[in-house]
Amino acid sequence: MKKLLLSFLIVGSLFAENFVNLQISNETLMLEGQYKVSFQEPFYVRGGYLINSEKSNFAYVGIKSEGQMIGADLPAKFSLFLDYVKTKNNSAIPVGIGINSYLNEFSIPLFIRGEMAYAPKILSFEEANKFLKLKVESGVRFIENGEVFVGYRNISFKKVYNSVFYGGVGFSF
């Protein structure tokens, strides 16, 4: 537990002024964060570490750009990202898309967000012949810099590595 708390504090300080979140299920614990590296344009470095009690751990690091879709008046931000993902015997360089939207019809700020990342065989290494990650989250931001959410995550290399529903908390700095 001490190692987990220390890791959380270290990663939280690395991602200062942006966000860090913790996703918890019965068998997994994932810590994610992102850091804005450009103040004029929304360009980020991001990373995450998944502790899986049944399999080897999973880590990723990458870059992301985010903004409004050109020519569309939608209440959502879209993102493009490129990550490097790694487990004990698999690695890949997936390209991904994401969406993040707040639902303004309610008295408290509800949100929904999702990501999909894919790497074909040419971008998959070691024992992996492809990579696919799907993630959907929904929650409430009940204080200015804090949120609570539930989500679903599916990570696959040759076969399903992790498919789980989880709950989590997030903090922005």
Task: Identify the role of each PLM range.
Residues 17, 29-30, 37-39, 64-173:
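Outer-membrane beta-barrel transmembrane domain signature
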Residues 1-19:
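Cleavable N-terminal export/targeting peptides
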Residues 1-2, 45, 112, 152:
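Short, intrinsically disordered low-complexity segments
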Residues 16-62:
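Short glycine/proline- and aromatic-enriched beta-strand/turn motifs that initiate or cap beta-hairpins
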Residues 5-10, 34, 66-68:
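Intrinsically disordered, low-complexity boundary segments flanking structured domains
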